[in-house]
């Protein structure tokens, strides 16, 4: 049992580190940088499951909250979480949760896509509140231009996680 817990903690730590590193791959655009964070969040959920995925994502958010520059473009601190794009970071929690739910491939992919929509909705709401735009206008700025790319990343993350699970036994 102890050996299995060490293995779980190792995977959780590695996933937090991977999220922190790959979050830095960001192409600046007008309001929201283009990133591959949707891929990483989905991969963590699909690979670690609900409990460990939530632990990993919570650890990532807490690291950023205390100022470690783990968020996109080497950002960290409370100001990032309460900024225009902070809602997306909070949206990682339902996103990783839904990706972590067990089931057959079509169900898991569908849940991952619902999780992505929950993440985008959190981002849209926070952006709309801070910018005083309508939800629709905020969606046009921070969500809709990236949605197809992010959906493809979620589907890709599912298949990568399945390969990883087979290789790491």
Locations of the language-model features?
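Membrane-helix interface segments
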Residues: 5, 50-55, 104-109, 134-135
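Juxtamembrane helix-entry segments on the extracytoplasmic side of multipass membrane proteins
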Residues: 36-37, 81-82, 134-140
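Alpha-helical membrane-inserting segments
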Residues: 18, 22, 26, 44, ...
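Hydrophobic transmembrane alpha-helices
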Residues: 1-54
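Short helix-perturbing small/polar motifs within transmembrane alpha-helices
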Residues: 10-14, 21, 78-121
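Interfacial aromatic-anchored transmembrane helix boundaries in multi-pass membrane proteins
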Residues: 23-36, 61-95
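Central hydrophobic cores of alpha-helical transmembrane segments
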Residues: 54-66, 110-115
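Membrane-embedded alpha-helical hairpins and interfacial helices in multi-pass inner-membrane proteins
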Residues: 74, 105-169
């Amino acid at each position: 049992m102890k050996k299995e817990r060490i293995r779980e903690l190792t995977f959780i730590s590695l996933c937090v580190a991977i999220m922190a590193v790959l979050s830095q791959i960001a192409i600046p655009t007008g309001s929201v940088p283009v990133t591959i964070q949707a891929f990483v969040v989905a991969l963590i959920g699909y690979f670690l499951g609900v409990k460990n995925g939530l632990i990993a994502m919570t650890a990532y958010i807490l690291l950023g909250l205390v100022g470690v520059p783990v968020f996109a473009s080497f950002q960290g601190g409370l100001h990032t979480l309460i900024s225009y794009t902070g809602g997306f970071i909070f949206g990682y929690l339902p996103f990783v949760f839904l990706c972590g739910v067990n089931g057959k491939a079509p169900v898991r992919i569908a849940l991952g896509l619902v999780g992505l929509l929950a993440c985008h909705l959190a981002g849209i709401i926070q952006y709309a509140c801070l910018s005083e735009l309508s939800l629709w206008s905020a969606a046009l700025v921070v969500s809709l231009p990236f949605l197809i790319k992010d959906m493809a990343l979620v589907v890709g993350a599912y298949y990568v996680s399945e390969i990883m699970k087979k290789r790491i036994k």
